[in-house]
Regions:
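Short, acidic/polar
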Residues: 14-28, 76-87, 131-141
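Acidic (Asp/Glu)-rich catalytic clusters
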Residues: 23-29, 44-58, 83-90, 106-116, ...
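Glycine-enriched alpha-helix->loop->beta-strand junction motifs that scaffold or abut catalytic
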Residues: 29-32, 89-94, 109-121, 143-149, ...
Length: 230
């Protein structure tokens, strides 16, 4: 099983114990599933149960162990996070690692690339819109490598904030970028940014994993409309 190569890839997020059941379903309103391990562990789901669900999956999986500073629900110790990443890595097709933790998680990234997994390097502005300087730093730290995507998610409070995110896609047309908005305008931003070429678009399968996140079914319709107009 491989991570989808066509785009936009619709990712259905799973953050709850009941949501793990989606992994074994034959049909989903998504091309792949993002498993938010931090949220599951915070919800008292044992790591062993997560691993067991991954063993029965019928869809490609993006594995995310998010840190609190970027929207995660569990305060990790570095060694604990690294160990769990490596334990679950054989059962997934892609991983998400924050740009801020690349150095600490480098062994995980190296192993993912060695075993043919996709890597999403992410950055998030959760509480307030990202500044131009912040975005420039994120872009400056990214090296476009095979099977690697830069994901930037920023809070949107105005059309100017959306324009700033859209400019990322317009100014880097050949880059593997996934760009999305957070907050009250999240759904509208996904429509605009997907149309501009965002490689990934997220929607929840069980409950929202980020502020304003629409459902995977809504996102699927949006992505289909974009594909039909290309």
């Amino acid at each position: 099983m491989k991570f989808p190569e066509t785009h936009p890839v619709v990712l259905g997020t799973v953050t709850t114990p009941s949501g793990l059941r989606f992994l074994a379903r034959k049909k989903l309103p998504a091309d792949a599933v993002e498993v938010r391990v931090d949220a599951l562990l915070a919800g008292k789901v044992p790591a062993e149960k997560i691993e067991a669900a991954l063993r029965t999956k019928k869809h490609p999986v993006l594995l995310t162990l998010r840190i609190p500073a970027e929207g995660g629900q569990l305060a990790w110790k570095v060694a604990q996070r690294r160990e769990l990443f490596l334990k679950l890595l054989p059962h997934v097709e892609a991983i998400d690692v924050e740009l801020a933790t690349v150095r600490a998680m480098q062994p995980v990234i190296d192993e993912a690339r060695r075993t043919g997994k996709n890597v999403v390097l992410s950055a998030h502005a959760i509480q307030k819109p990202a500044t131009p300087a912040q975005i420039a730093r994120w872009v400056g730290r990214f090296e476009p490598l095979p099977a690697t995507i830069l994901k930037i998610a920023g809070r949107i409070r105005s059309w100017r904030d959306l324009q700033q995110l859209a400019a990322l896609l317009v100014n880097h047309p050949g880059w593997p970028l996934a760009v999305m908005g957070l907050g009250p305008y999240a759904a509208q931003s996904r429509a605009v940014l997907t149309a501009l070429g965002s490689r990934l678009v997220y929607g929840y399968l069980d409950q929202p994993a980020a502020p304003g996140q629409p459902s995977a079914a809504e996102v699927r319709k949006m992505a289909l409309a974009v594909k039909l107009t290309k």
